């Protein structure tokens, strides 16, 4: 359905019209001044081009791929100009919702600029056509967070394309850090409790610590050792340095020291929980009030 029609009831913007771009620039400038670099903003979509902001015009203008890419680059550059310090993501539909492949010039253009991938089409169709770009995600997820969104839950229930196992598999294969739902939350939760719990156990990073040993007490001048076996049971890395920290208290319950083990960086630990090694940190408490000395750190 859709496409150009002389008597059509809807209209598409001319996405490189000077007036449109001037107004868009004004908006992005103001939004960037307020939100760029804000630690509470996880990501921002490059969502000002294409139907539903998804970077395609398949049901509207039906632009040729070359023209679609040219226009997409304009909007990508505008967002990057005003959000240089905030994670940006762009829909995979910008290169075609079902276009096969794992390497496209436009997606390389995004990757080189630190812009990551999102896929809003999970479970629009059933079976093998539930999603198309898990291979494309391989170029992004090791360094950048991947975002997924499933089709309207009610629509998939009517069409028969909903499948909880397939949704979980998409999280696994895309190594997704975020998954947004597309329906009334209370309904989707009520009807998919186990699926949502399974997704939450794998989505993004999930630090697990099956073993942690430490002495019951320490005294100044006597070395002590903390041993930890920890790993990442999620499908993606943290994308930032993440270290364990230990708080030591005195006999009155006051904080005597907070120790960060910078030799154990979860950002560098493999995802999927396939490896949960043990590391040991050996330290010595010096005289009261002078802190702690690290004698040695080894794995």
Regions found by a protein language model. Name each.
Residues 40, 222-224, 240-242, 273-277, ...:
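Residues at beta-strand starts and edge strands
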């Amino acid at each position: 359905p859709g496409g150009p029609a002389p008597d059509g009831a809807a209209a598409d913007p001319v996405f490189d019209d000077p007036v449109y771009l001037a107004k868009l620039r004004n908006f992005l400038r103001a939004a960037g001044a307020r939100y760029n670099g804000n630690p509470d903003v996880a990501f921002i979509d490059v969502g000002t081009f294409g139907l539903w902001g998804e970077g395609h015009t398949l049901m509207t203008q039906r632009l040729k791929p070359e023209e679609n890419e040219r226009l997409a680059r304009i909007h990508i550059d505008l967002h990057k100009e005003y959000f240089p310090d905030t994670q940006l993501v762009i829909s995979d539909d910008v290169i075609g919702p079902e276009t096969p492949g794992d390497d496209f010039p436009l997606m390389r253009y995004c990757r080189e600029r630190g812009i990551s991938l999102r896929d809003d089409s999970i479970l629009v169709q059933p079976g093998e056509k539930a999603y198309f770009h898990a291979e494309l995600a391989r170029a992004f997820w090791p360094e950048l967070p991947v975002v997924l969104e499933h089709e309207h839950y009610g629509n998939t229930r009517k069409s028969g394309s909903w499948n909880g196992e397939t949704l979980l598999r998409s999280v696994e294969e895309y190594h997704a850090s975020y998954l947004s739902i597309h329906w009334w939350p209370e309904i989707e939760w009520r009807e998919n409790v186990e699926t949502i719990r399974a997704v939450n156990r794998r989505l993004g990073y999930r630090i697990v610590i099956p073993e942690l040993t430490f002495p019951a007490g320490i005294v100044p001048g006597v070395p002590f050792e903390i041993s930890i076996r920890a790993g990442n049971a999620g499908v993606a890395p943290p994308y930032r340095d993440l270290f364990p920290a230990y708080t030591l208290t005195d006999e009155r319950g006051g904080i005597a020291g907070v120790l960060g083990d910078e030799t154990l960086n979860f950002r560098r630990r493999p995802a999927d929980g396939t490896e949960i090694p043990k590391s040991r940190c050996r330290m010595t408490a010096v005289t009261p009030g002078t802190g702690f000395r690290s004698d040695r750190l080894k794995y």
